[in-house]
Amino acid sequence: MTVAISAAVQQLPHGQGLALPAYQSAHAAGLDLLAAVAPDAPLVLAPGTYALVPTGLTLALPPGYEAQVRPRSGLAARHGVTVLNAPGTIDADYRGEIGVLLINHGSQPFTVRRGERIAQMVVARVARVDLTVAASLETTERGSGGFGSTGR
């Protein structure tokens, strides 16, 4: 079941004229984020480099929610370009500009142009945990195995 919530968004001056983030299909989980680079100054990511790409947006999520900034699969598959800190987290109390940290893992330079869809933003509920110190933890079949311990 899909839950609908409302969130206020503000376009910063360098984001004016760009479309707001939008879902691209009826059941899409993420809204596409657009690059708010200057029209006459595209951003070129050389292979192996990264940059913080502006979106020209600020967002006010309701308490109990976060937004996750995730890669677009097409950029990764076709160009080797992805979100470096995926998923990036936008907390409900953050009011700064949404930025997308893109990295080029490909072998060719990648040009980010104004209005290009560069990432997707998924809004999700957040559970907050109250940590308590324990002398021991309940044992499990897996135990402390990690980093590939469950097989290929």
From Swiss-Prot:
SUPFAM superfamilies: dUTPase-like. CDD domains: trimeric_dUTPase. Keywords: Hydrolase, Magnesium, Metal-binding, Nucleotide metabolism. GO terms for molecular function: dUTP diphosphatase activity; magnesium ion binding. GO terms for biological process: dUMP biosynthetic process; dUTP catabolic process. It comes from the Bacteria. PANTHER family: DEOXYURIDINE 5'-TRIPHOSPHATE NUCLEOTIDOHYDROLASE. This enzyme is involved in nucleotide metabolism: it produces dUMP, the immediate precursor of thymidine nucleotides and it decreases the intracellular concentration of dUTP so that uracil cannot be incorporated into DNA. Belongs to the dUTPase family. HAMAP family: dUTPase_bact. This is Deoxyuridine 5'-triphosphate nucleotidohydrolase. It comes from Rhodopseudomonas palustris (strain BisB18).
